[in-house]
Amino acid sequence: MATSSVDLWDAIAEEASAESMLWAEALRPTTERELEPVFSPLGEERWALGLETIYEGYLLHYGRPRLFAPPDRDTALRLGDYLYAPGLVRIAAPDEVDAVADRAGLISLCAQLRADGTPGDGAVWAASAALLGCGPLAGSREPAALEASARAAAGVEAVERALSLHRLRVG
């Protein structure tokens, strides 16, 4: 990563805290934070902060977040929505329109899979991280095809590790 892993997590926590006292109060104590990147290791280092910010937002909506412990579901949903925005901004910073479109596609497809009760959000995340900025997500919306693309781009072992960590977070 361009920044250290600790800096990545600090950046997410500090920005959220500065934005809202509600977000600051939802932060876990430093010693209880789980600083484990899930999908960012599959992609380019320059995307790590944006990916993990968006993924933390996703975990607030659908799983077990690493940095935050909101007091209720409404706060979790609002904080998750908030984190999507700076994550997208961080990805847009390198002037990569395709990368921002990929993130929007990721969020939309994962929400659709969740709403339909269909498995495969981990595969979508893996492909989206591994292929960020390449624009291929528009070509397929099938989790199996996306997972195969992720494995080809990032390697079988790296994708397996990410999917395993994801399953622990979202069940």
Regions found by a protein language model. Give the residues of each.
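All-alpha prenyltransferase/terpene-synthase fold signal
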Residues: 1-171
